[in-house]
């Protein structure tokens, strides 16, 4: 059976949760799920999928470093990229063609993923440290999002996640 690797770069865990949901949909391949910081060898994998989240408008540096260090391997395999960000909760920003973070990311890197998707993330105010809680609350206020810091808000469309996994033939 072919092997696939789902790699996540996450701050609060939603990207990992999305990877695990995708892995649970696998019918045609054996799937490993791994943090980007723990990936050591890509040789055994026919398919490599990278998911990364946005925090304060940026992907983590480890994502760019990983892509630069593994560009030739990524290009030689079936591959995909997905972004997780709360901006994607808005219909006019929930596809790779209209999501500003995906557009900037693709312009900034040399890798051209064969499949690209974007998923809305999660705001988990009770879990955040004081500074993050109020910085994110301010961002949500500006963008007309939820600001009740006693609540968590999950925007991820799990049907869309499962459809992406199916489209990748996992």
Predicted regions and their residues:
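N-terminal beta1-alpha1 ligand-phosphate binding loop
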Residues: 2-27
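Structural motif
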Residues: 7, 49-51
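Structured loop/turn residues at secondary-structure junctions
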Residues: 10, 54-55
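Short acidic low-complexity segments
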Residues: 33-43
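Structured loop/turn residues at beta-strand edges in well-structured enzyme cores
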Residues: 2, 43, 111
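FMN-binding flavodoxin-like domain, especially the glycine-rich phosphate-binding loop
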Residues: 25-32, 47-48, 55-170
């Amino acid at each position: 059976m072919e092997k696939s690797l789902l790699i996540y770069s996450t701050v609060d865990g939603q990207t990992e949760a999305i990877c695990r949901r995708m892995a649970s949909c696998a019918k045609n391949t054996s799937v490993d799920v791994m943090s980007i910081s723990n990936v050591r060898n890509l040789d055994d994998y026919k398919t490599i999928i990278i998911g990364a989240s946005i925090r304060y408008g940026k992907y983590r540096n480890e994502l760019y470093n990983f892509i630069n260090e593994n560009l030739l391997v990524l290009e030689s395999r079936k591959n995909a990229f997905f972004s997780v960000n709360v901006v994607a909760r808005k219909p006019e920003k929930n596809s790779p063609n209209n999501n500003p973070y995906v557009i900037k990311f693709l312009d900034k890197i040399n890798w051209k993923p064969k499949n690209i998707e974007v998923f809305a993330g999660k705001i988990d105010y009770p879990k955040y440290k004081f500074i993050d809680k109020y910085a994110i609350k301010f961002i949500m206020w500006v963008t007309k999002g939820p600001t009740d810091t006693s609540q968590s808000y999950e925007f991820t469309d799990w049907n869309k996640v499962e459809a992406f996994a199916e489209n990748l033939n996992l």
